[in-house]
């Protein structure tokens, strides 16, 4: 007797169609398309996780630059001054200070200016 494997193939199809729920049009109803776009969605998710790191770094730099210019110094000068003064603070923390605790940020700016001789 021939074994057709109906249960397993139905289970596999159900897995992809369930995952593709919410996709537009035929992508959520046709197995072949649902499987292709399910795999594609994994690629998008992988790329997105890498992109997120770039996006956040860009956001932090923008925030630091805006706050630094309010204090009369450029972003690049601030970072260089902090390196010269031996302050080891990352951009995420610096951006958080610029937004939430501006007085503490001003102290870091003063340290950078002092190291640069401004």
Curated annotation (Swiss-Prot):
MF annotations from Gene Ontology: rRNA binding; structural constituent of ribosome
Record's protein name: Large ribosomal subunit protein bL20
HAMAP family: Ribosomal_bL20
rRNA-binding as UniProt keyword: yes
Entry superkingdom: Bacteria
SUPFAM superfamilies (alphabetical): Ribosomal protein L20 (SSF74731)
Lineage: Bacteria, Thermotogati, Thermotogota, Thermotogae, Kosmotogales
UniProt cross-references to NCBIfam families, sorted A to Z: rplT_bact
